[in-house]
Structure formats: structure tokens, C-alpha cells
């Protein structure tokens, strides 16, 4: 059989709008709807907001533009991602974003800047999880993935969550399955 190496899923904006309208017609504003459909034009975000979406998740992964660039395909813009976050907030969405913790070349200062970034964009929800390389990838083969390494990643993740909670005491911080996997 044929195998597709990669596809880009582009949401059908009219379909999403119709689903949102149906939810709103059945439950009014009593049911909060969260979307996570990537970067869109402002008009699309507005259309979905008008149709009944309340929250939007769009992870930054790293507030360091150089690290961000290494995580995303060529031609993908850090500035565009940040612009989308500010647009979502301005349109009245509860904003969710987040980062990976323990990325290669990521420093503690980068993580501190990530927390400051959450405050700057006025994030309402934050998802943070440890970066866990797979042993069959080039990076996974370059890092000895030992129990000690996994323990360090777990502790770094817990510390990041704790410091974020101290700095941003009223934000929702999601628990991640990746963090749970390290604790097992």
C-alpha cells in the first residue's frame, strides 16, 4: 500500500463554524468550547468566536526564536505565531499556550523567559511538558536516555510548573501525560 509521509490538516472553517453554532443552539453559553486548530487568519478566529468558541489553544513550544525555528518547518514564522496569540486574546478568547521543557540547547534562562512570555500574552491556560526524545531518532541516539536522564527531566518539569504557579498564581496549568510517563 502507499504511505503518505506527511499531510497538513487544514480545518474546514465553515464546518467548524456550523459545529460551534449547533453547540451554541443546544447549550447556549453554558458549555465552554475550546479549539486547537493552529494558526488562522484573524477573520477565521473572529468567525469561530462569533459562532461560539470560548477558548483557543496555540502552543508556542519555546519563546526563544532560535529554538522555535529548530522545532518547526522552514518558512514557519515565530513572529506569526506570536501575532496569532495576541490576536486571539484581543478577540476575547481565553488563551492557552505552552512550551516543551528540556529541549536541546534550552537553558534555564530560556525557561524563565517562557514564564515571562506567558505573562506578556496574558495566557489563561498553560500546558508544559517534558521533551522526551525517542531512542530511534537522531537526537535520541545522541543523548543517553538513562533512568537518571528521565529523572532529571521529571524534576525540571515539576520545578517549571512550580515556578510558573508562583509567578502566575491564577492561571490554569494543565497536567501532561508526558510528565506522568516520566513519573512511572
What are these regions (language model features)?
Residues 174-180:
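Short catalytic/ligand-gating loop segments at beta-alpha or beta-beta junctions
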Amino acid at each position: 500500500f502507499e504511505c503518505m509521509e506527511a499531510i497538513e490538516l487544514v480545518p474546514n472553517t465553515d464546518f467548524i463554524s456550523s459545529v460551534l453554532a449547533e453547540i451554541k443552539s443546544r447549550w447556549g453559553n453554558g458549555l465552554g468550547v475550546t479549539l486547537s486548530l493552529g494558526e488562522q487568519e484573524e477573520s477565521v478566529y473572529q468567525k469561530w468566536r462569533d459562532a461560539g468558541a470560548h477558548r483557543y489553544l496555540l502552543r508556542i513550544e519555546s519563546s526563544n526564536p532560535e529554538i522555535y525555528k529548530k522545532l518547526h518547518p522552514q518558512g514557519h514564522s515565530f513572529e506569526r505565531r506570536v501575532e496569532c496569540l495576541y490576536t486571539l486574546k484581543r478577540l476575547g478568547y481565553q488563551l492557552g499556550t505552552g512550551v516543551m521543557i528540556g529541549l536541546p540547547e534550552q537553558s534555564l534562562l530560556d525557561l524563565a523567559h517562557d514564564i515571562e512570555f506567558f505573562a506578556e500574552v496574558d495566557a489563561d491556560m498553560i500546558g508544559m511538558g517534558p521533551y522526551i526524545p525517542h531512542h530511534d531518532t537522531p537526537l535520541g541516539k545522541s543523548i543517553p536516555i538513562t533512568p537518571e536522564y528521565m529523572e532529571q527531566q521529571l524534576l525540571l518539569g515539576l520545578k517549571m510548573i512550580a515556578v510558573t504557579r508562583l509567578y502566575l498564581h491564577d492561571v490554569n496549568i494543565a497536567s501532561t501525560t508526558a510528565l506522568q510517563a516520566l513519573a512511572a
